């Protein structure tokens, strides 16, 4: 009798199962932060390696193989030896894995100014996860097989799956919502942001911007003709948004820090061509009686 072919488990389900082994150390609501921070390291390395091989193949450029400028010009992050995925993965079962990850993030920010303040330095060490449990998650990410053209889809799939799995689409205490991908897709189709400035005052992890870029790609447009502006109050979501956009090669201005767009507008002079947002409609007591009375945005 022929053996039954083993059904392949989808990537996002495998990652979720690996995260479940971290229970007790990590709240399920934080799974997505844990995973996407590691996916960023894997994707950054894969893109770096492709660019590195491209430079080495050309006699005129191979002398610049360790010059960060020859990576950043193509929206690729330059990685030193200790920031590369094989080095990180080689330490996956060692007690210094969290220090290795922090060193990688620190060096990446140092070598790539666009990442300054965006990476979760110290995050994994603060979780105090037992290294043996953490290594199983790294193993799942290491086994991933995908093409670089699928990077956007992999990130999106994992993010949506994790949020849907834990019902974050429902109302939360902080008034935050996850906007389903089909809704974001409909919004971009309606406004058709072929070029100009796109603004989201409560951008979360940057999903509106990603979909805008996908819309441009689908219509054979040029991503460089759209300018991204945004703001996010949650520190974790702010970092996720910057990583999310950076790994896709999308330049953006999300302000120098996370901030509440109601009370601290980081783009006071911006006149955007398009505004895409899913505001926290159920947020209560978001200002005092005297706050914002002189704010130009609320006059008229």
Placement of each model-derived feature along the sequence:
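Intrinsic disorder/low-complexity signal
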Residues: 11, 294-295
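Conserved S-adenosyl-L-methionine
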Residues: 173-277, 282-292, 298
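Non-catalytic, mostly N-terminal accessory regions of nucleic-acid modification and defense proteins
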Residues: 1-194, 253-266
């Amino acid at each position: 009798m022929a053996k039954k072919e083993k059904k392949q488990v989808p990537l996002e389900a495998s990652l979720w199962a690996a995260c479940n082994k971290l229970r007790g150390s990590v709240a399920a609501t934080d799974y997505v932060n844990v995973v996407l921070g590691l996916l960023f390291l894997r994707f950054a390395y894969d893109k770096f390696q492709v660019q590195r091989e491209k430079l080495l193949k050309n006699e005129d450029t191979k002398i610049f193989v360790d010059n960060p400028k020859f990576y950043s010009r193509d929206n690729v992050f330059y990685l030193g030896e200790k920031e590369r995925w094989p080095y990180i993965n080689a330490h996956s079962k060692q007690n210094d894995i969290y220090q290795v990850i922090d060193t990688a993030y620190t060096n990446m920010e140092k070598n790539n100014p666009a990442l300054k303040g965006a990476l979760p330095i110290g995050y994994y060490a603060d979780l105090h996860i037992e290294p043996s449990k953490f290594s199983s998650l790294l193993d799942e990410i290491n086994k991933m097989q995908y093409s670089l053209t699928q990077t956007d889809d992999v990130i999106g799939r994992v993010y949506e799956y994790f949020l849907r799995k834990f019902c974050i689409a429902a109302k939360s205490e902080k008034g935050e919502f996850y906007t389903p991908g089909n809704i974001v897709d409909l919004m971009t189709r309606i406004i058709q942001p072929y070029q100009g400035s796109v603004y989201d005052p409560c951008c979360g992890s940057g999903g509106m911007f990603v979909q805008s870029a996908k819309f441009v790609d689908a219509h054979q447009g040029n991503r460089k003709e759209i300018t991204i502006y945004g703001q996010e109050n949650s520190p974790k979501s702010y970092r996720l948004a910057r990583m999310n956009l950076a790994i896709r090669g999308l330049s953006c201005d999300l302000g120098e820090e996370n901030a509440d767009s109601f009370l601290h507008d980081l783009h006071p002079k911006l006149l955007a061509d398009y505004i895409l947002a899913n505001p926290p409609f159920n947020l209560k007591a978001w200002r005092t009686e005297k706050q914002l009375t002189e704010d130009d945005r609320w006059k008229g």
